[in-house]
């Protein structure tokens, strides 16, 4: 049985897809892992020598890594709205953060996936710029939403979204620099980080960057948790992960 691996790191990483019968190949499971406020700088597979992200790096190394991918919505909810609709933010007036305009519900990806027989879940990021009921488009949406829900029928393919806040920039202001734990516990040394040229090289900024990279390492463990679950259930060879 041949397994093909692709991985694309935009704000997340990876795609695992492979064997099984021909019908299963036509309807793979889809696992969409979303993270917040990240860039290629935050991951080892894009050249950061100071952060440990072995799971994401292995996904990139085993498949296709995108080096010229760009967001068509340069902020939180506009970017998310573009991905879930497959459209430019300006197409439906979604380019302003949390500026609500009427949007045709049928443009949303979960509507198409459910019509194709997929069980669709979201845990639980639905911050889209739309007046539509962002939860109604899912079979299950909320803190307990999962592809492991007993409501999913046997052998029914799933489209499942999970979101982690571990790298959200709001986390930076949640802890004063003198309240953060020793970064050495995570293998990080703020003094040795390579800062972007446009930021001030001061201890506070170095602490912020190290704190953010600590979140990236937490994300790597989080991604690994899902991959382990897919392998345990023997779903890994017919699941797209991105």
Regions found by a protein language model. Give the residues of each.
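Formylglycine-dependent sulfatase
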Residues: 2, 6, 14, 20-242
């Amino acid at each position: 049985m041949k397994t093909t691996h692709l991985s694309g790191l935009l704000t997340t990483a990876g795609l695992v897809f492979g064997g099984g019968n021909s019908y299963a190949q036509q309807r793979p499971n889809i696992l969409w892992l979303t993270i917040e406020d990240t860039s290629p700088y935050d991951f080892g597979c894009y050249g950061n020598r100071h952060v440990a992200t072995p799971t994401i790096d292995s996904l990139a190394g085993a498949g296709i890594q995108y080096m010229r991918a760009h967001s068509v919505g340069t902020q939180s909810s506009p970017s998310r709205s573009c991905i879930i609709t497959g459209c430019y933010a300006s197409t439906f007036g979604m380019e302003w953060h949390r500026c609500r305009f009427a949007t045709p519900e049928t443009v949303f990806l979960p509507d198409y996936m459910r019509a194709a027989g997929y069980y669709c879940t979201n845990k639980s990021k639905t911050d889209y710029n739309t007046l539509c009921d962002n939860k109604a488009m899912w079979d299950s949406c909320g803190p307990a939403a999962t592809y492991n829900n007993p409501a999913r029928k046997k052998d029914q393919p799933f489209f499942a979204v999970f979101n982690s806040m571990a790298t959200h920039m709001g986390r930076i202001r949640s802890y004063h620099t003198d309240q953060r734990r020793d970064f050495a516990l995570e293998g990080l040394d703020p003094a040795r980080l390579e800062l972007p040229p446009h930021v001030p090289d001061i201890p506070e900024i170095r602490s912020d960057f190290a704190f953010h990279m600590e979140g990236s390492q937490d994300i790597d463990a989080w991604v690994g948790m899902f991959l382990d679950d897919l392998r345990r259930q023997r779903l890994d060879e017919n699941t797209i992960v991105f």
